[in-house]
Amino acid sequence: MSNHLPGVFIVSDSIGETAEMVVRAAASQFNSGNMEIRQVPNISDTETLEEIINQAAASNFIIAYTLVINELADFLKMEARKKGVICVDVLGPVIEAFKSVSDIEPRREPGLLRKVDEMYYRRVEAVEFAVRYDDGKDPRGVMQSDIVLVGVSRTSKTPLSMYLAHKRIKVANVPLVPEVEPPEEIFQVEKGKVIGLVINPEQLNQIRTERLKTLGLKGQASYANLERILEEMEYAQEIMKRLGCPVIDVTNRAVEETASKILEIYYRRLSHV
């Protein structure tokens, strides 16, 4: 017996983060100074495992592993037992527990947690992107985006940008206003990336009037004036015609329904790239 913790080989058919976190958490319960950890990720063959077992036996290390491929895990357990090396299966018992109380078979596919993490971070990145490049704040976002939404005010550009961001799609949106020249970038991006949004003028009039009321302003302001709305719509349609972009009518459509149409266009474009 020793007053020091043994070294540990972290062995995984993915990157080994899970096993390392568990090992460090366990080691923190012992006041024995530093512990040597040797990490061996992306294991895919028994030859590498055999080499690790031999090194562990020679150095008096233990092995902590996350191997979801049964053949590799079985080989490691059998050969380690022969050499007197202690092996700790970090993931297997939990997988078997889930399996025992359900009719679901585990996928036995390495790296799934990392894929989930990557999806999460891509979603966060897309949400941050939507906030940063909302309402034409910075035209640089147009070139970096997956989709660019254009349309007059209150055509659901921002809600759609956020909804699509939660599907890990980076969306910039640009308001079309007669007095403001749209950024040149929307004419420079690849065809099909820009999508126009239009709406029935009377419905837009109602939406804007309600918006003004929530802000404590009078509904008679030019922003909600039907004549002004028609002027804006005409200008927006001219820009969309110049762009040659697909156009979606959002009248009486829920955000989810419009987003579905946008995704159809988006995936169709990707399939032709």
From Swiss-Prot:
Residue spans making up a coiled coil are none
- Please give the positions of the paired cysteines in each disulfide bond: none
User: Which Pfam families does the entry mention?
Assistant: Kinase-PPPase
Enzyme Commission number(s) of this protein = 2.7.11.32, 2.7.4.27
Classify the source by domain of life. Bacteria
Keyword set includes Transferase:
yes
Catalytic reactions of this protein: N(tele)-phospho-L-histidyl/L-threonyl-[pyruvate, phosphate dikinase] + ADP = N(tele)-phospho-L-histidyl/O-phospho-L-threonyl-[pyruvate, phosphate dikinase] + AMP + H(+); N(tele)-phospho-L-histidyl/O-phospho-L-threonyl-[pyruvate, phosphate dikinase] + phosphate + H(+) = N(tele)-phospho-L-histidyl/L-threonyl-[pyruvate, phosphate dikinase] + diphosphate
InterPro entries per the UniProt record, alphabetical: Kinase-pyrophosphorylase, PPDK_reg
Single GO term (MF): phosphotransferase activity, phosphate group as acceptor
Q: Please tell me which top-level EC class this enzyme sits in.
A: transferase
Keyword terms: Kinase, Nucleotide-binding, Serine/threonine-protein kinase, Transferase
| Chain positions recorded as ADP binding sites | G151, V152, S153, R154, T155, S156, K157, T158
Note whether Nuclease occurs among the keywords: no
So what family is this one in? Belongs to the pyruvate, phosphate/water dikinase regulatory protein family. PDRP subfamily.
So what does this one do?
Bifunctional serine/threonine kinase and phosphorylase involved in the regulation of the pyruvate, phosphate dikinase (PPDK) by catalyzing its phosphorylation/dephosphorylation.
HAMAP family listed in its UniProt record? PDRP
User: NCBIfam families of this UniProt entry?
Assistant: PRK05339.1 (NF003742)
Tell me what this protein is called: Putative pyruvate, phosphate dikinase regulatory protein 2
